[in-house]
Amino acid sequence: MNNKNIKEEFINAFGEEKWNELEILKPLQDAVDLVCKEYLGIKPIPVVFEALSEDVARYDFKLQAIILNNKYKDDYIEVLDGCLHELEHHWQRIYIANNDTPKARRWKKEFENYDKYNQTQEIEIDACAFSQVILSCEFGLTYKHPNNYIQVLIDDYIRSRKILLDD
């Protein structure tokens, strides 16, 4: 069976929208796999699209997957940023489970008292900073937080090298 037949059979079984979704997911999954391997040293995490109420992306602990809001599937940079952000949250939890540093204790406390609407939490600033650094260095893409105040905090976090320190 050739690629054209596979595509036709898939579309007949699941519909053209699902095929298009797979074509969008492939480069995202490849990017996530690369970052897991080269930057975080963790096993790859599956990426899927679903209907989400508001977030661009979230990490599903039960499924061990990154769920992307299908409303954003045409905005590659936005969903790639969401993937990287959620990957960093996954890595933060691994870090917390395996380390007893001041940073691990702060992050643990922030996860235990998580406030979805407080974007100034260190775990959020760290995830945003990680995403922006990887987008720039690995993919040559620029993404800035839509809130200028939060972006200043992210820039300060990156400049301070806290992203690299175990303080």
Q: Predicted regions: what is each one?
A:
Residues 1-4, 92:
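N-terminal low-structure segments adjacent to metalloprotease catalytic domains
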Residues 4-62, 75-76:
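Auxiliary, metal-adjacent structural segments of Zn-dependent hydrolase domains
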Residues 6-10, 14, 113-167:
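Long, well-structured alpha-helical subdomains associated
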Residues 20, 24, 28, 80, ...:
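Hydrophobic (often cysteine-bearing) scaffold residues that line and stabilize catalytic clefts
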Residues 66-83:
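Short pre-active-site segment immediately N-terminal to the catalytic Zn-binding motif
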Residues 77-78, 93-125:
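Post-HEXXH active-site segment of zinc metalloproteases
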Residues 81-94:
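Active-site recognition of the HExxH zinc-binding catalytic motif
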Residues 91-103, 136-146:
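Substrate-binding/catalytic groove segments of enzymes
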